[in-house]
Every structure is written in structure tokens, then in C-alpha cells.
Amino acid sequence: QASFHDDELKIIIYKDHLITYYRGVRTVDLKQVAHLYHHIFTMHRGFASNRNSTLIAVRSNNKKYQMPIRNIGKTTDVQLQSTFDYLYNHFPHIRLGM
């Protein structure tokens, strides 16, 4: 049973692990994460643009892990706030945001 689940963004927190399952499954141990932030990459192709959302987890050894999440448009940051609130309350050692 997951302690936190966001089906919209495809994020799970299970015990001490952050799991994303959008475009594959990625897992990181939250006890080893020092910094976590949201990054949006916009790719332009002709007249169309594609926005990809990724959580970047920086471990204490300064290695960065990219964890894709579902981009739901302009409300992605608002939806992600509940995940950050949970992490803030249960993993206070993690620096959240930029």
C-alpha cells in the first residue's frame, strides 16, 4: 500500500521510495535525496511544441536522476504541490524546488 499516490501525474511514494511510472518506471531512495525539483523541457518542431515534465532528484553524492512525470499543462505545478507538501512533512531533509 502506497503512502502517497498521484494518479494524474503518475507519482507514487512507497515507504522511503519515490516512484514515477510515466514513460517507464523510475525509482529513487528518498533517504539519499538531498534536493528535488520540477523541470519543464520544451521542444519545438515546426509549428508544434512539446513540453515534457521531469522531477530531478539530486542525491547526496550530487548525481542527478531524471524521473519523467505526466505534463497536464499549466496546472502541473499546482497538482505537484500536494506531492511536495507530503515530502516536506515526511522527508524534511530534502530541499524542494529550485
Each model region followed by its residue ranges:
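Anionic N-terminal interaction surfaces
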Residues: 1-15
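Helix N-cap / beta->alpha transition motif
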Residues: 14, 29, 97-98
